């Protein structure tokens, strides 16, 4: 029932683990997303309560428990460091790539196709990026790889115990992301069965063994949370963070039907062309495997397109079937015309040169190394094309991209995430003796790093409307940090309270020009943040 691991699987895992954790100790925890996970896990470790997530001392039902367990375990092993914060995503990224190799190898028996599938997944821009992040999506990717593989294998060999393992992985997904971890794969498999017009396949999707395994995985934690927190958990987790997210956009300004298409095209680089070519070539025969991957990939994108809230990583798991299609595309190129290889080379050069040219607009970093590497890689790849070294071309594309992205991490991501974090003004906050306020925006990285919990100030409706901040009032339920209204801040300023205000450039200018501007003095300003203190 379980896979016997091939020796190459271990090599794939270790290689990509090294790729994904390299340099993580240099990347600070960024705001506004990563810091919420890091702070919640920190409070879990410090409080000793490993079952009910908390943030700012309040119970927090934003996500299920899995990511907090993993981060807390990482902190327990490595300490509360930036490396520890990013280690779970790197670990599960490597596990996902290795499982794709193992799964494709077991299903097809083809070493080249298996290596290509894993290589394409592991070197895709969006996978590399998220494998360095502090979010839930890489753990979800791992769980989804297991669900997709074991469910498909269970349908092929008609073994309910394979399906039971798939349900176990779906349970991990539900502990990671919520009900969507079961609902989405279930819908996609029902669509696949419908396309195959197989009622027996529909019945095979619901074995009693699988349902028992799923309940055994998810019920202990979900049952505990309902028993302990009752309707507060139901309303917060299922209501606000699931139903509201699906029906009312958290970011209305990006709620477009085409939102995930550019993410697919850009996130799949450098393999976008190979994936599209695989789709094109596969359409002629439309084998079972082709139909399966197309339904899993495009079905995922369509599902999240229909949701009200759009977010760059929501359709992330579509990279699993698309990587298999990309491998099919690369293999098909060896029998195609020589010019067809531009399906692979074109998007690769777009990525490399976009990053190379982009360095001329970056205000930081020593970029001559990257520019030289891009030129050398381009010449080498051109030589492979000229001399028809068809095996070397995909290898050069993947390895070259990892080299380019490694330089971007060191020279670009480190300072960029610094600007997205509070680390650039830690010294001012640490040395200030008095209450600290965030006006409008909020950075959970301050309490994470400094054990100082600022008070959030909600701008007036007029100021929010001026900067086109429009979303349902229900989303205010996410703000569980200490907070006050704008008028209360003004009252405290006018009463002479000593305070430090952190805000963005727009709101900083608004405050300086408001009725309380005479009480404020600018302390420091950067491209992102303005610090104001009372006179």
Where are these regions (language model features)?
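Membrane-embedded architecture of ER/inner-membrane glycosylation machinery
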Residues: 164, 278-535
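Membrane-integral, polyisoprenol-dependent glycosyltransferases
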Residues: 1-340
């Amino acid at each position: 029932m379980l896979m016997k691991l091939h020796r190459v699987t271990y090599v794939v895992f270790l290689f990509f683990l090294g790729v994904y954790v390299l340099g993580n100790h240099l990347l600070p925890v960024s705001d506004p997303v990563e810091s919420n996970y890091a702070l919640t896990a920190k409070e879990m470790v410090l409080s000793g309560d490993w079952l009910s997530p908390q943030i700012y001392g309040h119970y927090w039902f934003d996500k299920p428990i899995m990511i907090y367990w993993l981060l807390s375990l990482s902190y327990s092993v490595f300490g509360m460091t930036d490396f520890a914060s990013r280690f779970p995503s790197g670990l599960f990224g490597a596990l996902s790539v290795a499982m794709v190799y193992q799964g494709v190898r077991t299903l097809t028996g083809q070493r080249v196709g298996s290596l290509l599938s894993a290589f394409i997944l592991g070197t895709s821009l969006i996978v590399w990026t998220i494998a360095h992040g502090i979010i839930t999506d890489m753990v979800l990717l791992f769980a989804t790889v297991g669900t997709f593989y074991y469910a498909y294998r269970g349908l092929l060999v008609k073994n309910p115990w394979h399906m039971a393992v798939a349900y176990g992985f779906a349970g991990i997904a539900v502990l990671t992301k919520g009900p969507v971890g079961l609902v989405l794969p279930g819908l996609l498999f029902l669509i696949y069965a419908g396309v195959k017009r197989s009622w027996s396949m529909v019945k095979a999707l619901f074995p009693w063994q699988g349902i028992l395994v799923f309940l055994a995985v998810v019920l202990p934690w979900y049952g505990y949370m309902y028993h302990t927190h009752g309707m507060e958990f139901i309303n917060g987790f299922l209501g606000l963070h699931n139903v509201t997210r699906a029906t009312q956009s958290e970011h209305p300004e990006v709620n477009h039907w085409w939102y995930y298409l550019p993410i697919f095209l850009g996130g799949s680089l450098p393999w976008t062309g190979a994936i599209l070519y695989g789709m094109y070539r596969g359409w002629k025969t439309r084998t079972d495997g082709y139909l399966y991957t197309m339904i899993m990939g495009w079905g995922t994108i369509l599902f999240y397109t229909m949701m009200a809230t759009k977010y760059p990583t929501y359709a992330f798991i579509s990279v699993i079937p698309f990587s298999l299609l990309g491998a099919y595309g690369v293999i098909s190129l060896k029998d195609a015309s020589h010019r067809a290889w531009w399906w692979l080379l074109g998007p690769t050069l777009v990525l490399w040169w976009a990053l190379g040219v982009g360095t001329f607009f970056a205000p930081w970093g020593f970029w001559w190394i990257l520019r030289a590497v891009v030129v050398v890689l381009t010449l080498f790849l051109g030589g492979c094309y000229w001399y028809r070294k068809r095996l070397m071309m995909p290898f050069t594309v993947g390895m070259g991209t990892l080299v380019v992205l490694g330089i971007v991490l060191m020279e670009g991501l480190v300072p960029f995430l610094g600007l997205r974090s509070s680390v650039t003004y830690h010294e001012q906050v640490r040395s200030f003796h008095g209450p600290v306020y965030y006006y409008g925006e909020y950075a959970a990285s301050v309490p994470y790093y400094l054990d100082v919990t600022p008070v959030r100030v909600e701008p007036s409706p007029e100021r929010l409307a001026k900067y086109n901040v429009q979303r349902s009032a229900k989303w205010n339920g996410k703000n569980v940090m200490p907070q006050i209204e704008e008028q209360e801040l003004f009252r405290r300023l006018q009463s002479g309270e000593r305070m430090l205000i952190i805000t963005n450039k727009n709101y900083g200018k608004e405050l300086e020009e408001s009725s309380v501007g005479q009480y404020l003095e600018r302390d420091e300003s950067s491209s992102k943040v303005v610090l104001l203190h009372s006179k």
